[in-house]
């Protein structure tokens, strides 16, 4: 749907549903609501799904100060366990793709409780595997890594997996292990995923595994050469005809990233723009945020600072609206990095400290956000705030950080950054 058609569809569907409620036609509201959830999911009209689904369930996450009193639900008598499961699942998926990832995990948990207790009519083993896949993705995206491991352990015990979902399960394990800095198991899991892909002669699966292997070398090992190698293999194995819209956007962005790391800035900008436009074909994907952030980085590296700041600021607004935790922290990190390069050290410090406060609040993966720590150490050092610098080093230690820190405290005018985080510009670190 284009934006205008999407808006009209959303307004029409939710207005009819609300009319049934105002008329106290609760059974009709349930009938229309469940039918509409299915059709609006197909249109990727997630706002309507969330509006209708949360109203039918009368179930929203409680804040710490909220009363524990249950809200009367006039729809409950007209929904059996199967209907409730499908509504919870639809709302969870809508939040996973479009809005608040933490909310998504909440509704997935509720859906899974029903799935454990009841046999859901016409919900096949493939449907169950797909549920675990999406549930684990929601946990990963929400930075709920403990929950992600629990879900994947459930998935591992499930006997209805086929080769594809064996591949998916090990792939998701690798992503979680990387996030929690268990690099040995991350590599074992991604290699198992890659082994399945090769045995099944599925190059598209290989492409996905190579992408995630590249992220291990990029984030854990800060290894530029192998980052380029495995992203290039992912691009080489990619089959566009078999790809989802989201995967198409991912592979375009990864190809752009390789061009960025190899100083092909014009090609990188072209591909990043393609990735963003591809992602925009889906209403509300996280890949939109990731692609726009990358585009901003490329613009900055191409001496288009004004365009880069505009791109990042737009991305920051959208990231905040959707509570994209990694996106928010990365964007503040990149704004801080850009200010460092402009010798605007006070706003650089403000951006980086805001990024660090959110990094702590969101409990996102330390492995993913090394550039934040490098840059914050640098800004504290240059501003003479040695107390904050030293405390941060003690708290945020990871491999490579000691040698960087030792260069800072030595007072050396020339900080050497070869062998550190691959994405850097004039010895300042950016995050994609």
Where are these regions (language model features)?
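Extended alpha-helical scaffolding segments used for macromolecular assembly and cargo binding
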Residues: 1-98, 103-107, 120
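Residue signature of alpha-solenoid helical repeat architecture, marking inter-repeat boundaries
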Residues: 7, 11, 27, 82, ...
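Acidic, Ser/Thr-rich low-complexity linear motifs
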Residues: 7, 67-79, 120-125, 247, ...
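Amphipathic alpha-helical segments of tetratricopeptide repeats
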Residues: 17, 37-38, 57-65, 72, ...
């Amino acid at each position: 749907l284009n934006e205008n058609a999407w808006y009209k569809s959303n307004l029409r569907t939710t207005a009819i549903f609300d009319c049934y409620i105002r008329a106290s036609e609760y059974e009709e509201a349930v009938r229309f609501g469940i039918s509409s959830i299915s059709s609006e999911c197909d249109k990727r009209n997630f706002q309507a799904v969330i509006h209708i689904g949360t109203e039918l369930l009368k179930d929203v996450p409680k804040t710490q100060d909220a009363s524990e009193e249950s809200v009367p639900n006039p729809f409950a008598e007209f929904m059996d366990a199967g209907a409730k499961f499908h509504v919870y699942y639809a709302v969870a998926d809508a939040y996973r793709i479009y809005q608040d990832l933490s909310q998504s995990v909440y509704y997935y948990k509720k859906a899974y409780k029903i799935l454990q207790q009841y046999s859901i009519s016409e919900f096949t083993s493939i449907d169950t595997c797909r549920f675990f896949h999406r549930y684990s993705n929601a946990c990963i995206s929400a930075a709920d890594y403990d929950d992600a491991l629990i879900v994947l352990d459930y998935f591992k015990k499930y006997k209805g997996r086929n080769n594809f979902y064996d591949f998916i399960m090990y792939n998701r394990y690798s992503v979680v292990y990387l996030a929690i800095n268990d690099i040995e198991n991350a590599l074992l899991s991604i290699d198992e995923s890659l082994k399945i892909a090769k045995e099944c002669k599925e190059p598209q699966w290989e492409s996905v595994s190579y992408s995630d292997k590249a992220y291990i070398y990029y984030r854990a090992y800060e290894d530029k050469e192998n980052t380029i190698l495995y992203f290039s293999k992912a691009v080489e194995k990619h089959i566009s005809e078999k790809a989802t819209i989201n995967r198409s956007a991912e592979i375009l962005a990864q190809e752009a990233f390789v061009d960025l790391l190899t100083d092909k800035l014009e090609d990188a900008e072209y591909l990043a723009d393609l990735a963003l436009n591809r992602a925009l074909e889906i209403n509300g994907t996280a890949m939109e945020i990731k692609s726009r952030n990358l585009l901003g980085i490329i613009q900055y590296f191409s001496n288009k600072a004004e365009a880069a700041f505009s791109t990042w600021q737009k991305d920051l607004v959208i990231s905040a609206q959707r509570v994209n935790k990694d996106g928010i922290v990365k964007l503040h990190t990149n704004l801080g990095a850009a200010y460092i390069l402009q010798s605007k050290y006070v706003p650089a410090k403000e951006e980086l400290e805001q990024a660090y406060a959110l990094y702590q609040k969101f409990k996102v993966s330390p492995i993913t956000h090394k550039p934040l720590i490098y840059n914050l150490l640098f800004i504290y050092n240059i501003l003479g705030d040695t107390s904050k610098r030293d405390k941060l080093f003690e708290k945020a230690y990871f491999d490579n950080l000691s040698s960087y820190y030792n260069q800072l405290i030595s007072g050396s005018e020339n900080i050497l950054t070869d062998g550190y985080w691959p994405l850097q510009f004039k010895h300042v670190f950016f995050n994609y």
